[in-house]
Amino acid sequence: MQTVKFADNEDSQFSLNEVVLRAARLDDAEALTEMFNLPGVRHGTLRQPFQSVEKTRKSMENRGPNDIAIVGEWRGKIVANAGLFRRAGRQSHIADLVISVHDDFAGRAVGTYILAALIDTADNWHDIRRIELNVFTDNLPAIRLYEKFGFELEGTLRNDAYRDGKYVDAHVMARLR
């Protein structure tokens, strides 16, 4: 077990066995927004500072019927989220991946746990053949995680996003089965 120190200075023993994965719900919007606004989460994603609960809720309401969105919850606190967003028509075999892990839980295998469940669902329940993602080139822990699950580098998008006052590159990665 690892000790987790939360922003409110509460120490707790963390065990991955206590993380419950479940479908994301609209009433998760506030907790998800809180996580999305954390500096580490924001640094690794395309999220803007000060995202509102309303924006999160609207995004959740606009999910397609074949999209998969899950959260990881530990002792009632959302510590991760991940989703696969299915394309349509001739690309219906493709889904785009998003994943975030709460700053206090980064490096504790939560990302591995939630991504494994999501990929199992994609492979065994939705017949998704190709999963794509973009990841900032300096996000080495995320790149290693994706490689562990068979994602391969397909290219680099130069000056893909503006972050902390400068443009940053992103890799395009995909997993085929």
Listing of model-derived features with the role each one plays in the protein:
Residues M1-S15:
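Acyl-donor-binding surface of acyltransferase catalytic domains
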Residues F6, L26-D27, T45-D104, L115-A116, ...:
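Acetyl-CoA-dependent GNAT
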Residues G107-A122, I143-K148:
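Conserved acetyl-CoA-binding loop-helix of GNAT-fold acetyltransferases
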Residues A122-N134:
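Conserved GNAT acetyl-CoA-binding A-motif
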